[in-house]
From Swiss-Prot:
Any matching Pfam family: YidD
Primary site of residence: membrane
Lineage: Bacteria, Bacillati, Actinomycetota, Actinomycetes, Mycobacteriales
Organism: Rhodococcus jostii (strain RHA1)
Coiled coil: none
Protein name listed in UniProt: Putative membrane protein insertion efficiency factor
Keyword ATP-binding belongs to the record: no
Cellular localization per UniProt: Cell membrane
Region annotated Disordered, chain positions: 97-121
Length: 121
């Protein structure tokens, strides 16, 4: 009896994992589509032009990395901000994609680790 119950739970966990994986693929589709067009630009248009990007990584590398790291909404926003910097008045230089923050890392904690310390201050 235990074996059948264990198998049932394993099947449910596998189905949930499969559904979660499928949902992640669907959510990544818009970013992948934009990355596809950026790769087309890098393959066919960029070689015809002189290298002019004043940043490291280049704007197209930055766009691909920001889309992969942050998804389509924030990645596209970061890319537009980066392209807006690409002007003669900006010095350029090293401008990496910001790291992805954990949703709960920057927020307030509901239960402080040491309540006594906070009460004494």
């Amino acid at each position: 009896m235990k074996s059948a119950l264990h198998e049932s739970r394993a099947d449910t966990a596998e189905a949930t994992s499969s559904a979660s994986s499928a949902w992640k693929s669907v959510r990544a589709l818009p970013a992948r589509t934009l990355i596809f067009f950026i790769e087309l630009y890098r393959t066919y248009v960029s070689p015809l032009r002189m290298p002019t990007c004043r940043f490291m990584p280049t704007c197209s590398e930055y766009a691909v990395e920001s889309l992969r790291t942050h998804g389509v909404i924030k990645g596209l926003f970061l890319t537009v901000v980066r392209l807006a910097k690409c002007a003669p008045w900006h010095p350029g230089g090293w401008d990496p994609v910001p790291a992805r923050r954990d949703r709960h890392a920057g927020g307030r904690r509901c239960c402080p680790a040491n309540v006594d310390e906070q009460r004494s201050t």
